[in-house]
Amino acid sequence: MRDVWTMSAAAQAEAVRRGDVSAVELVDGHLERIAEVNPRVNAVTQLMAEQARAAAARIDRLRANGTAPGPLAGVPFTVKETTPVEGVPTTFGVPRFRDLVAQADAPPVARLRAAGAVPIGHANVPTLVLAGMHTRSELFGDTVNPWDPGRTPGGSSGGDAVAVATGMAALGLGNDSGGSVRIPAQFCGVAGLKPSTGRFPADHRVLGPDDPGPASQMLVTDGPLARSVGDLRLAYEVLAGTDPRDPRALPVPLYGQPLPGPVKVAVVADPGGQGVHPAVGAAVAAAADALRDAGYDVREVADVPRMAEALDAYGRITVTEFAPSWPVVRTLLGPGGDRYIARAMERTPPASAGELVRLMGTWLGIRRSWAQFLDEYPLLLGPVFTEPPVEPGLESRDGAGRDRVAAGMRLCTVTSFVGVPAVAVPTGLADGLPCGVQLVGRAFREDLCLDAAQAVEDRLGVLTPVDPRG
C-alpha cells in the first residue's frame, strides 16, 4: 500500500486491523515521509525510529494471535517536547535538559499507546514553551510553516501541528493553556482540541517531584491535533478518562444528553471589539453559514462575557505564580529568548497576597458568567487568532508586536482561563494561507464542539496533508 501517510488515522488503524498493511509498514511509511520532509520544516526533533518499529511489531504480533490491537492500531503520533515518553529525553527545547530521560510515559502518551498508537518522535516547541508564540527552541532551532516559510507555524505545539499537516504523523499530542494547540492548528490548516479542565489526565511533574502552582494546574490541558475532525474524535475517546497520577481528571461520560431542538450557536466574530482581520472575519462567516446549513440555530451575539476582566486576571495570576522562578528561567531562556516573558513581567507586576486572593475570587466569578452564557448558548463560534499566520517572532520583536499577538489570541486565552472545551477547525485558504475558527462549548461537552466542527468540515473541506511550499 503506497503513501500510507496520506490516509486518515481512522483509515490507517482500520487497514492494520484488516491486515491490509502491517503496523511496521505503517511506521516505516511515516519514517520515510519524515526523512523526506523534516529537513525542510524541522518539526520532528527526536526521532524514535527503533522504538516505534518495536512497538509496531508488538501490534502485529497481537493481531496475528487474534488479539484486538486497539482503536488506533499502528497509528504514528508525535509528542510535544514537554511531554514525557519513556526512555526518551524531555528537553523543553533547552540544551541543559538534553539528557533528562523520561522514566515513564506521561498519562496521555500511555493512553494513546494502550489504544495501539505508536509514538514516532518528539516535536519542537518554543524554548521552555516560554520564549513566545513562534516555535523556535534553543536546542533545535526554528520550525517552518509548510504553507509559507515567511509565516510562523504558531506555538507552542507548532512542531506537532507541522508534523500532522505534512503527513509525518497522523496525530500530534500537544498541550494548551491559552491557544497552544488551537493557534498552530489554524496556522497549519489542521484540527485541534483543547479539552475541558479535568477531561484528560496529565502529570506535569516533569522537571522534579513538585507539582506546578494552581494556575498551571488549572490552565494547562493536553490536547490532540489531527488532519480531520473524525481523527480528533478518535483521539478524544482514547485520551479521556482518569489516572491516579492526576486527581483533577474526572470520570465524566464522553457524550452528554442530546439537547432539545436545534442547538443554539452564539457567533462572536470580534471578541472584545479589538478588531479582526477581514480574512478571519470571512472564515467565521463561512463557518456560521455551514452551521446554519447543518440545522443549527445560529445567532449573532454582541460579545462574550467579561473579556477584558478575564484577560487582566489571567495575566496577573500567571505572572504572580511565575515570578519566584523568573531569575532561573531567564537564565535558561538565554539572551534574546527572554524578551517575550520579560515584557510581560515588566507590564504586569506580581500581585500581593491580598490581591491574589481577590483575583482567585474574580476567576471563579468569570467562570460562573461563562457557565451562564453557555447555558443559553451551548456553543460559541469565534476566531482562533484574529489574523492570518503572522511573521515568525513578532511577539518578541517589540512591545507593539507582543501586544498584537496577545490581542490576536484573546479568545483562546479567555477560554483556557474558564476551562471550557474548544475545537479548532479549518475553513479554507485566504491568499494561500489556512484560515479557521474555533467552536467553544459547555464544560465537558466536547461532543457538541466536535459535532459542530464536523458539520463545518463536511461543508468546507480538509486542507491537509500538504507538501512544504516555498
Question: Each predicted region: which residue ranges?
Answer:
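An N-terminal boundary/leader segment
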Residues: 1-54, 293-295, 465-470
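Glycine-rich, small-residue loops and helix-cap segments
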Residues: 19, 30, 74, 114, ...
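Residue-level signal for inorganic ion chemistry
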Residues: 30, 52, 232, 265, ...
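Acidic/His- and Gly-rich active-site-bordering loop/insert found
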Residues: 52-54, 62-137
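Short helix-loop capping/hinge segments that flank enzyme active sites or metal/cofactor-binding pockets
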Residues: 72-92, 260-268, 317-371, 424-434
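General beta-strand structural signal in soluble alpha/beta enzymes
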Residues: 79, 119-122, 173-175, 300, ...
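Short glycine/serine-rich loop segments
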Residues: 104-236, 416-429, 433-438
